[in-house]
Every structure is written in structure tokens, then in C-alpha cells.
């Protein structure tokens, strides 16, 4: 291999799954440096998005390890750990972040996760779950005279043209809500900067409990709003740092019980009519209401259970569409047979959070300047060891 031109080596490696690529780092310094090569990182990410087999699902669950003390567990499944057809097995990601046993995933972008501290109510880390690398985010804006926020929503996005990543937080304060203003304050962090920027009030409030952006499409993050008279999809253009409105589909039932997702790079919406059916829509031309197209409809009577809230997770192998059903199960729709079925996952917890993820070599450390804290956790048979940078 070392006799091949570097360009050919990079081309070969760019087509490999993320797990064997990360293992290469343990071989020698040459392979460690090669997996940090910017050309390989870019080519591998490009190949991963082209290949549907590169899709994985990251699961987060909380395990009771002591009285009143929970620890967060990260696991994943992909096309390579199917036991037989629809039977999958959780693979644990044996990583530990410093001083942070309990966290939530509030964004996945280009192989990186944005991790949120639910106790402090702040975004805490940018983390690559397959390489173990992380970077600590600077503390967000919190007025010293104000009590802690009531709620915080997060978005994590990327500018392709400039290779810039941004985190946005929408912060709700009880005092403002009490005074009749339910709109959150918007703060933006460009990764590489040492401080957040206050860009003013968002024009809409979001659905209560909607912490994470549900879709990153066309350079914009998307949430749902339930302000009186404004049942709409709220967008945030990551480049322009401007809020906007995207029209939702004209659902067959007229009821708005929907969740957003991304299917083949397009905004999608899954809606359900209580106890009767669920329908999936895709926006073929971004921002154009008439381009919403219904992909399929599934009746509860045909599948034998009440479907309820579902959220599109993405296309799996053979064009199947995976859906999150509530917070405890996965469904798969097969467009060839027009059938919906449940997915069995060995070792799955009773409840979990799940995000669609494409494994990458993108390093959180490369996105930050000097003066911030970096780390790398390397798992092995003897446990987990931290390397500081």
C-alpha cells in the first residue's frame, strides 16, 4: 500500500465504512496522519452521502446506574449489523465525556453531534461518536440578572460554500412569557469563534418540548410553530442568519399532527390522523407549497396497530423509508410492497432518542481556534483513555 501514490490510497480509503477507517489510526503515525488529511475527509464524506449503506442511526438512552442517577448510553445500528432481515443488534459506542454523564443529542451534521446538557440547559460539546473526538463549546449568553432559561431549542447546521458550522440556540425566559411574549431569544455561535452572538428575538415560538431542529435542508434548519394563527414550519437560514416560513402540505385529514425529516436531501413530513392512517409527504422544490407530493399512505387497519406520531428518519437500503414511532420503536415502509412493518432491535431500551447519522472523519478540533478545550477518547480492552490537546 505504501508504494501506491497518495492520491490512489486516498481514493480507496474514501470508499470504506467509517469504523475500519477509524481503526487505521491505531496502526501507526502514517495512518493516523492520513485519516486527518483534508482531502480524504472531504472525499469520504462525499462518498458517504452518495451511498445509502453509509446511513446509521444513533440511539441515546438513559440508564439508572445509582439511586436518582442516570447515565447516558450511546448506541448505533447500520446496514452492517442486521442479524437477519429486520432484526438488528445495538452496538454500543463506548465513549465517556468529561464531567458529563447525562446529555441529549440536539443535532447531527456531517458526522458530528451537538450534545446538550439538560441540567445546565446549555449546548456543551461538538462530538464525533465514531472517532471519539470532541470540542467543548464556549458558554452561551446568560444575563447574570436573569434566572435560568425555562426552555432552550437548538439547531446545528453547515455552510457548504465556506465549510463553516454554526449552532443556534433559541432561549425562552419565564419573565418574557409571563409578560405575554412567547418568542425566544436567538443566539448564534460560529464554530471557531470564542463567543456567542445575540441576533434578537425569533419571530415565532416553537412547539413546546421541541428542543432539536427536525430537519436541515437547503442550508436551513427547521422547527414547527404552534403560535395562534401561525401553525407553520419555521426555518432559519444558517448563512444569512434569517428566520422564515416554509408552507406545510395540505394534509388529507386537515389535521396538523406531523413531524419533519429529510428524505434524499428533501424536506419531508409525516402526518397522522388519529387511529386511522399516516401519510408521508416530500417537498420536491424547496419553499414551493404546490411541490409537496404525497409519497404514501398507510391505514392502521392494514398494519394491525395504531400508528400515532411518526417521524421520517431517512431512506435505508433498497429504498425503504424508516420512521420513528413514538419514542420506543422503529417502523419501515417498503415502497415496492406498499407495506409497513416493525423493526426488531435486540437490546433496545424502553425509550430512546434517535438521530440519523452519516459517519465521517470530520474532526471537531479542526473547527475551533486556539484557547478551547479538545479531547479524544480511545476505547480499548482495558477501558477508555483520554488524550488532551
Give the positions of each predicted feature.
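N-terminal entry/capping and adjacent linker segments that precede and initiate structured domains
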Residues: 1-389
Amino acid at each position: 500500500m505504501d508504494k501506491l501514490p497518495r492520491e490512489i490510497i486516498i481514493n480507496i480509503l474514501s470508499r470504506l465504512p467509517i469504523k475500519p477507517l477509524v481503526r487505521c489510526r491505531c496502526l501507526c503515525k502514517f495512518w493516523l496522519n492520513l485519516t486527518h488529511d483534508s482531502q480524504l475527509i472531504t472525499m469520504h464524506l462525499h462518498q458517504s452521502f452518495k451511498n445509502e449503506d453509509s446511513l446509521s442511526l444513533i440511539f441515546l438512552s438513559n440508564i439508572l446506574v445509582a439511586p436518582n442517577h442516570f447515565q447516558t448510553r450511546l448506541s448505533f445500528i447500520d446496514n452492517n449489523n442486521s442479524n437477519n432481515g429486520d432484526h438488528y443488534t445495538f452496538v454500543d459506542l463506548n465513549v465517556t465525556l468529561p464531567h458529563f454523564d447525562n446529555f441529549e443529542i440536539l443535532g447531527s451534521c456531517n458526522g458530528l453531534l451537538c450534545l446538550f446538557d439538560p441540567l445546565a440547559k446549555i449546548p456543551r460539546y461538538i462530538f464525533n461518536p465514531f472517532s471519539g473526538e470532541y470540542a467543548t463549546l464556549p458558554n452561551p449568553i446568560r444575563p447574570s440578572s436573569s434566572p435560568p432559561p425555562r426552555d432552550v431549542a437548538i439547531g446545528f447546521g453547515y455552510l457548504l460554500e465556506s465549510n463553516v458550522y454554526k449552532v443556534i440556540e433559541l432561549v425562552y425566559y419565564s419573565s418574557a412569557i409571563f409578560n405575554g411574549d412567547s418568542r425566544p431569544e436567538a443566539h448564534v455561535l460560529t464554530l471557531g469563534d470564542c463567543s456567542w452572538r445575540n441576533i434578537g428575538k425569533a419571530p415565532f415560538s416553537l412547539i413546546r418540548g421541541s428542543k432539536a431542529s427536525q430537519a436541515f435542508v437547503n442550508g436551513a434548519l427547521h422547527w414547527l410553530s404552534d403560535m395562534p394563527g401561525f401553525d407553520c414550519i419555521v426555518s432559519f437560514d444558517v448563512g444569512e442568519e434569517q428566520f422564515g416560513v416554509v408552507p406545510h402540505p395540505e394534509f388529507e385529514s386537515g389535521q396538523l399532527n406531523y413531524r419533519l425529516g429529510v428524505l434524499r436531501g428533501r424536506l419531508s413530513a409525516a402526518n397522522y390522523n388519529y387511529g386511522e392512517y399516516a401519510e408521508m409527504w416530500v417537498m420536491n422544490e424547496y419553499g414551493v407549497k404546490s411541490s409537496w407530493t404525497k409519497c404514501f399512505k398507510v391505514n392502521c387497519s392494514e398494519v394491525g396497530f395504531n400508528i400515532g406520531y411518526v417521524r421520517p428518519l431517512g431512506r435505508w437500503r433498497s429504498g425503504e423509508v424508516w420512521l420513528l414511532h413514538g419514542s420506543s420503536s422503529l417502523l419501515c415502509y417498503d415502497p415496492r410492497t406498499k407495506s409497513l412493518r416493525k423493526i426488531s432491535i435486540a437490546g433496545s431500551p424502553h425509550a430512546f432518542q434517535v438521530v440519523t447519522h452519516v459517519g465521517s472523519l470530520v474532526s471537531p478540533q479542526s473547527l475551533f481556534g486556539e484557547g478551547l478545550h479538545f479531547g479524544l477518547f480511545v476505547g480499548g480492552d482495558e477501558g477508555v483513555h483520554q488524550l488532551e490537546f
